[in-house]
A protein has these predicted regions:
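Basic, Gly/Ser/Thr-rich N-terminal segments that form RNA-phosphate-binding interfaces in CRISPR RAMP
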Residues: 1-264
Length: 264
């Protein structure tokens, strides 16, 4: 019971912690580094898990079972540049993929670039082996408040280490948190100086790949997906419609009316 109380306090502290330190993005922008660029995307429900494979030392039954990625300098939850680079590289052909699958990935990249004659293998090498730099992604503090984290409980039903169907405690970034995705990019040019794929085209490509494929752990069950716009919250809809008729409990009748219509 004592351990349970301690763990609950720790978990509550994680959930309620308010981040006050700004990310380094504003400083990067102010430096006006050659090739620096960024774009913003919002996490979608149920949120973002990143760095779950990081080492975590607590072994108690109800302790958080997986690690997480926190920036060493600011303490902010973030997507490391290496993770961002790896996730984007996985969207390109090669790296052990079957030939048929690689061809599909190549066609997908060409379609996003709207360039049928681009050499995807050369583009891949130029992006991931040469000059382009992946700085990572940092949350925008104050966009939806300063509380960024929530607890997530997953109940596996598999054999092995977690064979008992007991909930596993994990950390996630909340839905509706805006992230800055940051890069230093350069144009890809032919020998005569003709631009084949510009830095701006790369930026748009990366943005669409993240929107399509997601980022982080458990994307196949909904985590790690982003959108360009923050979803409208139900409470915001309620505020924008103050004249709706409420029932005797102070609750809107709108949902009940829809339910009743559905039963007819």
């Amino acid at each position: 019971e004592e351990n349970d109380s301690i763990l609950k306090q720790h978990n509550d502290a994680i959930r309620d912690f308010s981040f006050k330190i700004a990310s380094p993005v504003e400083k990067w922008r102010a430096l006006q580094m050659k090739g620096y660029t960024d774009f913003q995307l919002c996490t979608q429900y149920p949120g973002l898990m990143i760095g779950t494979g990081n080492e975590h030392s607590l072994k108690m039954d109800d302790a958080i079972k997986c690690g997480f990625s926190f920036d060493y300098t600011t303490g902010l939850p973030y997507i490391p540049g290496s993770s961002l680079k790896g996730a984007l590289r996985a969207c390109f052909p090669g790296d052990g993929k079957k030939e048929e699958i690689s061809q599909e990935y190549a066609a997908y990249i060409r379609a996003l670039l709207d360039k049928e004659d681009v050499d995807i293998e050369q583009l891949k090498e130029n992006i991931f082996e040469n000059r382009d730099i992946f700085l990572g992604a940092f949350p925008v503090i104050g966009f939806t408040g300063k509380k960024l984290l929530e607890m997530e409980f997953i109940t596996p039903h598999t054999s092995g280490r977690f064979k008992n169907p007991n909930p596993i405690s994990q950390i996630k970034v909340r839905p509706d948190v805006k992230f800055d995705f940051c890069f230093i990019l350069s144009d890809d040019c032919s020998e005569d100086g003709t631009v084949i794929v510009s830095a701006e085209e790369k930026k748009k490509l990366f943005k669409q790949l993240i929107l399509d494929m997601g980022m982080g752990a458990k994307t196949h069950v909904g985590f790690g997906h982003f959108s360009e716009r923050r979803p409208i919250q139900l409470r915001e809809i309620a505020v924008s419609q103050p004249n709706r008729t409420n029932n005797r409990y102070g609750q809107s009748n709108r949902g009940q009316n829809q339910y009743n219509r559905g039963r007819r």
